[in-house]
C-alpha cells in the first residue's frame, strides 16, 4: 500500500479537474427542466467508471432517472464491497446568496480549508464524495493493489426521495449481492477529527394546503368576515410545538427510545464548541427541545420543521388580498423505531383535526424513509476505523447524524448487508445551502483512505 499516497499526489490536479467538470453539469433531479443534464451526468459517471477500471458498466433504466451500475470482479471467492452514491444535486436557490454561480466551480481558500475548497452545488453532497470512490478504484487498479471485488450503484434521485431505487434493488438482488455496503454521503466532526456515522435519522416529508374562500378576495371588502388561510396556516403550524419545543402531535414520541446516560455521556465527549457553532451560523443563541444539548437535538431527537411556506401575493409592491389558499412543505426527521409511514399518518390525522371549520385542509405525503443504526462491533466498522487510523493517525469517533439516507434501511432489508458510512465532509461545507463547498484536502484524503478500507475489510473477512 506504499504507492497510495504518492499516486494521489501525482494525480491530484487531474482528480480535482475531473470533479470540477462533473460539477459543471446541473443535475437537479427535482426540476424536470434539467432532465437532460441529469441524464448527461449519468453518462459522465459511466465513462469515469470505465476509465477507473471497471470491467462492466451499464446505465440501468428505471421508472425515473437511470442508475449507473459498474463492477470490478477479480475473484468471486473474495469479499465484495458495494459502493452507493448519487449524482443528482439539490436546487441551488436562492441564487442571489451565492458568491459565485453554483455550476461554475471555483476553488477558494477558507479559514477551515486553507488548501482550498471547491465551491459548487453538489461538491460535497454528493458528487465530490461519490467521486472519491471512483478515483480510489482507479488508484487500486492502476497500482495492482485491489484486494477485493467492488461494485458501484450510483443513482440520480436521492434528492427527491430515491423513488426508483427500491424498484431497482428488488429486481437486481443477485447483481447487487455483496458483503458490505460503503457510502460517503455524511461528514466528519472536524477536519482533524475523523468520525464514522453509526446512526441516521428517518424522514417523513409532507405538503399541506389550507383552503378558505373559492377565490382571492379584496381585504377591505372581506377582511375580518372571512377566514384568511395564511393566518390560519401559520397558527396551525405554530401549535405543532409547545413552549418547550416539544412536538405536540399525539403519539409522535411513543416509540422514541431514550439513550442511556452512558450513551449521552459518550456523545458529550465529542469535540464541539457551542460558540464556534453559533459564530459559523451568525446566530446569538441556539434553539430547540428543552433538556437536550445541541448535538443531541441534531442527531438523536426527532424534529418537525417547515421547509417552505407560501400563499397570496408575494410580488413587488402591494396587493391587498385575502388568499384563497395557503401552502407549506414540512419535514420530520425521525429516530430509529419511529416508522415514517406511521408518523405521516399521525401528522395527517392531527393536522386535519386542528383545522377550524372555516377552512378545509389537505395533507399530501411525499417521500420518507426509516432511521438506521449500525453496530460498531461488525467487521465493516472495524475496517473503516483501521483505515482512518492509517491515514489520519487517530481513531475515528462514532457519531449519529441528524441527516437521512432512507435507502440504508432498504439495503439491509433487501440485500441483507450492513452499511458503513465513511463521510469526509464538514458541517460548515453548506450542503443544501448557497456556497456549498468541499475541501480539496478532504477530497484527496478520502481517495487516500478508501483503499485502506478495502484492504482491512478483506483481511478481516478471510
Residue ranges of model-derived segments:
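Acidic, glycine-rich active-site loops and adjacent beta-strand->loop/helix elements
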Residues: 87-89, 153-162, 184-189, 212-214, ...
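Flexible glycine/proline-rich, aromatic-decorated loop/lid segments
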Residues: 195-211
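An extended, acidic, His-containing surface patch that forms the Zn2+-binding/catalytic region
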Residues: 190, 248-325, 337-346, 354, ...
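Polar, glycine-rich mid-to-C-terminal structural blocks
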Residues: 213-216, 220-277
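Active-site metal-coordination/substrate-binding segment of hydrolases
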Residues: 78-151, 445
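Acidic/histidine-rich catalytic neighborhood of metal-dependent amide-processing enzymes
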Residues: 122-199, 461-462
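A common structural junction motif
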Residues: 87-88, 240, 244, 349-358
Amino acid at each position: 500500500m506504499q504507492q497510495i499516497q504518492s499516486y494521489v499526489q501525482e494525480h491530484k490536479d487531474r482528480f480535482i479537474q475531473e470533479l470540477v467538470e462533473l460539477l459543471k453539469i446541473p443535475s437537479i433531479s427535482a426540476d424536470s427542466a434539467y432532465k437532460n443534464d441529469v441524464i448527461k451526468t449519468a453518462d459522465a459517471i459511466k465513462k469515469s467508471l470505465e476509465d477507473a477500471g471497471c470491467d462492466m458498466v451499464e446505465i440501468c433504466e428505471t421508472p425515473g432517472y437511470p442508475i449507473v451500475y459498474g463492477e470490478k470482479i477479480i475473484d468471486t471467492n473474495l469479499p465484495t464491497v458495494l459502493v452507493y452514491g448519487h449524482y443528482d444535486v439539490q436546487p441551488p436557490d436562492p441564487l442571489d446568496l451565492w458568491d459565485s454561480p453554483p455550476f461554475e466551480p471555483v476553488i477558494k481558500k477558507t479559514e477551515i480549508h486553507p488548501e482550498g475548497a471547491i465551491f459548487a452545488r453538489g461538491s460535497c453532497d454528493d458528487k465530490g464524495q461519490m467521486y472519491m470512490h471512483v478515483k480510489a478504484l482507479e488508484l487500486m487498479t492502476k497500482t495492482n493493489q485491489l484486494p477485493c471485488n467492488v461494485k458501484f450503484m450510483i443513482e440520480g434521485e436521492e434528492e427527491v426521495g430515491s423513488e426508483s431505487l427500491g424498484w431497482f434493488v428488488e429486481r437486481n438482488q443477485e447483481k447487487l449481492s455483496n458483503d458490505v455496503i460503503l457510502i460517503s454521503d455524511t461528514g466528519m466532526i472536524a477536519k482533524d477529527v475523523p468520525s464514522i456515522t453509526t446512526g441516521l435519522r428517518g424522514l417523513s416529508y409532507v405538503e399541506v394546503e389550507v383552503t378558505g374562500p373559492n377565490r382571492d378576495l379584496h381585504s377591505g371588502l372581506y377582511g375580518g368576515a372571512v377566514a384568511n388561510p395564511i393566518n390560519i396556516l401559520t397558527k396551525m403550524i405554530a401549535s405543532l410545538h409547545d413552549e418547550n419545543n416539544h412536538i405536540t402531535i399525539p403519539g409522535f414520541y411513543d416509540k422514541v427510545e431514550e439513550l442511556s446516560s452512558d450513551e449521552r455521556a459518550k456523545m458529550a465527549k465529542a469535540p464541539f464548541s457551542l460558540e464556534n457553532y453559533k459564530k459559523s451560523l451568525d446566530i446569538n443563541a441556539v434553539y430547540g427541545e428543552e433538556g437536550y444539548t445541541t448535538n443531541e437535538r441534531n442527531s438523536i431527537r426527532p424534529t418537525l420543521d417547515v421547509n417552505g411556506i407560501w400563499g397570496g401575493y408575494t410580488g413587488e409592491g402591494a396587493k391587498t388580498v385575502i388568499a384563497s389558499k395557503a401552502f407549506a412543505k414540512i419535514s420530520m426527521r425521525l429516530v430509529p423505531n419511529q416508522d415514517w409511514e406511521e408518523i405521516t399518518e399521525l401528522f395527517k390525522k392531527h393536522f386535519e383535526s386542528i383545522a377550524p371549520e372555516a377552512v378545509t385542509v389537505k395533507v399530501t405525503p411525499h417521500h420518507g424513509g426509516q432511521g438506521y443504526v449500525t453496530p460498531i462491533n461488525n467487521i465493516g466498522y472495524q475496517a473503516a476505523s483501521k483505515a482512518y487510523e492509517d491515514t489520519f493517525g487517530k481513531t475515528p469517533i462514532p457519531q449519529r447524524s441528524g441527516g437521512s439516507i432512507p435507502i440504508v434501511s432498504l439495503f439491509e432489508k433487501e440485500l441483507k448487508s450492513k452499511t458503513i458510512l465513511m463521510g469526509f465532509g464538514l458541517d460548515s461545507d453548506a450542503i443544501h445551502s448557497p456556497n456549498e463547498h468541499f475541501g480539496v484536502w478532504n477530497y484527496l484524503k478520502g481517495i487516500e483512505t478508501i483503499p485502506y478500507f478495502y484492504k482491512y475489510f478483506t483481511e478481516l473477512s478471510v
